């Protein structure tokens, strides 16, 4: 049997895998265990009561967290004319059409989010094999294909997170950094859960939000008592 690292031993001793933690207690515990030499992210996994094999039960969208994610987000926008000027004014790092597409094809991928105006999708569509596998392909459901590119840029910069269930019906995303206050992480999580509930497929049956767990980049997952979230009350 492999020998546990000191960090793993501490996590095993401190985290009760059978317990549902109050959100405040969970955040304090994760912050105590976050001993990496970098500022760890706080990630969340939400198990949804959906059948991910059925397209009409898949959950996908985006929401702006009230306290952001703590990340500096670089935004690329495919658009032209007045929209290009508006995107630059809103803070986009890269703006263009065919010229920007050529940079992407050449491997210049120094951005975290891609936004496109509808008229630019003829250009972006040819980049599907590059952007798709990286989760960067613009999509109307996440607000990244829109005539109002300036607003989309502002949302991305303000801490918008995109979510999409995996093949097991689980949503994985981030809700901030371990340096955030307990209240900030709690409110970000509540905002995400609220958005997920609004995105509930009409055909989904039974309990929708089945389990919520939060973890740090290098830490163990801690299951959350949903009753400790305002959204659940």
Swiss-Prot record:
Listed under GO biological process in this entry are: regulation of translation; translation
Q: Which PROSITE patterns match?
A: RIBOSOMAL_L1
Output the Gene Ontology terms for molecular function. Answer: rRNA binding; structural constituent of ribosome; tRNA binding
**One Pfam family for this entry, by name?**
Ribosomal_L1
Note whether Ribonucleoprotein occurs among the keywords.
yes
GO CC annotations on file: cytosolic large ribosomal subunit
**Listed CDD domains:** Ribosomal_L1
Keyword annotations for this protein, in alphabetical order, are: Repressor, Ribonucleoprotein, Ribosomal protein, RNA-binding, rRNA-binding, Translation regulation, tRNA-binding
Q: How does it assemble?
A: Part of the 50S ribosomal subunit.
Q: What does this protein do?
A: Binds directly to 23S rRNA. The L1 stalk is quite mobile in the ribosome, and is involved in E site tRNA release. Protein L1 is also a translational repressor protein, it controls the translation of the L11 operon by binding to its mRNA.
Tell me the protein family, please.
Answer: Belongs to the universal ribosomal protein uL1 family.
Protein name as it appears in the record: Large ribosomal subunit protein uL1
Organism source for this protein? Answer: Shewanella frigidimarina (strain NCIMB 400)
